[in-house]
Curated annotation (Swiss-Prot):
Protein's UniProt name: D-erythrose-4-phosphate dehydrogenase
InterPro entries the UniProt entry points to: E4P_DH_bac, GlycerAld/Erythrose_P_DH, GlycerAld_3-P_DH_AS, GlycerAld_3-P_DH_cat, GlycerAld_3-P_DH_NAD(P)-bd, Glyceraldehyde-3-P_DH_1, NAD(P)-bd_dom_sf
Entry-linked PROSITE patterns: GAPDH
One protein family per Pfam: Gp_dh_C
Organism: Salmonella gallinarum (strain 287/91 / NCTC 13346)
Main location: cytoplasm
Annotated site residues (Activates thiol group during catalysis) in this chain: H182
Gene3D superfamilies referenced in this protein's UniProt entry, alphabetically: Dihydrodipicolinate Reductase, domain 2 (3.30.360.10), NAD(P)-binding Rossmann-like Domain (3.40.50.720)
One GO BP: pyridoxal phosphate biosynthetic process
Main enzyme class: oxidoreductase
Domain of life: Bacteria
Active site, UniProt feature: C155 (nucleophile)
Length: 348
C-alpha cells in the first residue's frame, strides 16, 4: 500500500521531508498529494530546488498555478489558514505531516482528522494530550492503530534518546545533564531586532546565544523513570545546520571509556543500524551535514571520570536526520493500520 500524505507547513522540515522522500527512494511507499503553505507557489518551488544547507535538488521542480511538479509527480498546493478548511477527505489523505512548528496539541490534531485525514504526525514535541510520542528506533513498535495523533518528538530528542537507552540498558543511569549546541534557527535575528526573548534580539551570526530548551521533558516523556533525574541547557551557535549534544550521565556500574565506545559502535553496526552511527575520524560539524542518522557518536570525545561519570559527544543533522525519521514514523503509523474509532484511543 502506498501511503498518501499531505504536508502542512513547507519550511525547513517540510521541504526536507520532500527531498528525503525522493532521495531515499521511498516513492513507492509514500506519495505526497498536497502541501499547505501560506507562501506563494513560486517561492515554494524555488526553495525546494535550491537550498543553502543541502544544495540543489536532483529532481526537476516547477510550478503551474497551484500545482507543484517534482519530476513527473504532481502535488496540489493549498494556502489555507484554517485547519477545518483543508480538503484532506477529498484528497484521500492517510497521514498529515504537520511541519508548521505552530500546531501541536490534540485540538489541532483533531481538526486535521475532522477535515478527513486518518492520522496526524507533528514534526515537533506536542502536548501531553497526544496519543503517542515516537522516537523511531526506540519505541515505534509500541504504536497501535488507534494512535491517530502522534508527535515525532524533536531533532535533539531523536538524537539523544537512543544513546541514553543504550547507556541505561548497559550500565544503569542514575542521573544526567545535557547541553545542546544547536545551529541558528529562523526564530533568531539577522541583525539586532526585537524579540520576546531578549537574548534572541541579538544577531545570530555574531554570538553564542543561550536559549530555553524542553529537552529534559522530552527525555522523561519517552523514559518516565528519569523524571527529575535529567536537566538540559541549550545554546545556539553561528552555523546554519548540524547540532552537537554533550551528554553526561552517572551510572551504577563501573565502566571504562573504551567499553562505552565498544558498546555504542556495536549498536551502530547492529540493533541501531541506520539510526545511530559511530565515528572516530577527526570531523567537524559540516562533515555531518546531510547525514540521515538520528545520532552520530564521536568516539574521540568519550570520557569517563571516576568509573561512574560518562561524557559523550553526539552529532546530528538537525534537519536531514529528523526529516528521514518523519518518513520512518509515517510508515510505522500506516503499518499498524487505521482505526477510526476515536473512543478506542490509548496513550503511548
Amino acid at each position: 500500500m502506498t501511503v498518501r500524505i499531505a504536508i502542512n507547513g513547507f519550511g525547513r522540515i517540510g521541504r526536507n521531508v520532500v527531498r528525503a522522500l525522493y532521495e531515499s527512494g521511498r516513492r513507492a511507499e509514500i506519495t505526497v498529494v498536497a502541501i499547505n503553505e501560506l507562501a506563494d507557489a513560486a517561492g515554494m518551488a524555488h526553495l525546494l530546488k535550491y537550498d543553502t544547507s543541502h544544495g540543489r535538488f536532483a529532481w526537476e521542480v516547477r510550478h503551474e498555478r497551484e500545482q507543484l511538479f517534482v519530476g513527473d509527480d504532481v502535488i496540489r498546493i493549498l494556502h489555507e489558514r484554517t485547519l477545518a478548511d483543508l480538503p484532506w477527505r477529498e484528497l484521500g489523505v492517510d497521514v498529515v505531516l504537520d511541519c508548521t512548528g505552530v500546531y501541536g496539541n490534540r485540538e489541532h490534531g483533531e481538526a486535521h482528522i475532522a477535515a478527513g485525514a486518518k492520522k496526524v504526525l507533528f514534526s515537533h514535541p506536542g502536548s501531553n494530550g497526544l496519543d503517542a510520542t515516537v522516537v523511531f528506533g526506540v519505541n515505534q513498535n509500541e504504536l497501535r492503530a488507534e494512535h491517530r495523533i502522534v508527535s515525532n518528538a524533536s531533532c535533539t530528542t531523536n538524537c539523544i534518546i537512543p544513546v541514553i537507552k543504550l547507556l541505561d540498558d548497559a550500565y544503569g543511569i542514575e542521573s544526567g545533564t545535557v547541553t545542546t549546541i544547536h545551529s541558528a534557527m529562523n526564530d533568531q535575528q539577522v541583525i539586532d531586532a526585537y524579540h520576546s526573548d531578549l537574548r534572541r534580539t541579538r544577531a545570530a551570526s555574531q554570538s553564542i546565544i543561550p536559549v530555553d530548551t524542553k529537552l529534559a521533558a522530552g527525555i522523561t516523556r519517552i523514559f518516565p523513570q528519569f523524571n527529575d533525574r535529567f536537566e538540559a541547557i541549550a545554546v545556539r551557535v553561528p552555523t546554519i545546520n548540524v547540532t552537537a549534544i554533550d551528554l553526561s550521565v552517572t551510572v551504577k556500574k563501573p565502566v571504562k571509556a573504551s567499553e562505552v565506545n565498544q558498546l555504542l559502535q556495536k549498536a551502530a553496526q547492529g540493533a541501531f543500524h541506520g539510526i545511530v552511527d559511530y565515528t572516530e575520524s577527526p570531523l567537524v560539524s559540516i562533515d555531518f551535514n546531510h547525514d540521515p542518522h538520528s545520532a552520530i557518536v564521536d568516539g574521540t570525545q568519550t570520557r569517563v571520570s571516576g568509573a561512574h561519570l560518562i561524557k559523550t559527544l553526539v552529532w546530528c543533522d538537525n534537519e536531514w536526520g529528523f526529516a528521514n525519521r518523519m518518513l520512518d514514523t509515517t510508515l510505522a503509523m500506516a503499518a499498524v493500520g487505521f482505526r477510526l474509532d476515536a473512543s478506542a484511543s490509548t496513550k503511548l
